[in-house]
Amino acid sequence: MTYKNILDKLVGKWIHQRTSYFIHNQQIDYHQEEIKLKQIDNIYISTKDNNSLYQYELSNKINNQKIYYIFSKQEESEFGKLHKITNDEIKYYRFTIHTHNCIKIESVRENISYNEYIYLINNRFKITISILKRGQKYLATSFISEIKIFN
């Protein structure tokens, strides 16, 4: 599966269930929501040759929040860049196609590392596992399951 094919499979309306476990206080958080990811073309960014650029908008029906994602990758590079844009901040990540059906997203800042694995089980089901660590010590983990809905 190619870079573009994997990103295309993320687009759509999803029922999103997240369970997060915070190790230091043994707290478990759970929530469910309906989200929609669509590809957009209205963000202006100049591109260089041999650089693939894909822009997405993630919207949450409940709180009307919108998050923008910009994926960029040079053709010859194994890694790509991911920018997550919200109302008050921009976060920077790098990503790679980890396996034929998995995207790995990672970020390191001040000895804290974030790793996220998005597994595309099939066209209607995906699982995401996220891990937050300080050095070699685990801080939190998260499990997300998403089912694509059509209506």
Swiss-Prot record:
This is Chromophore lyase CpcS/CpeS homolog. Keywords: Chloroplast, Lyase, Plastid. It comes from Gracilaria tenuistipitata var. liui (Red alga). The keyword Chloroplast applies. Its EC number is 4.-.-.-. Might function to covalently attach a chromophore to Cys residue(s) of phycobiliproteins. It comes from the Eukaryota. It is an enzyme of class 4 (lyase). Transmembrane segments: none annotated.
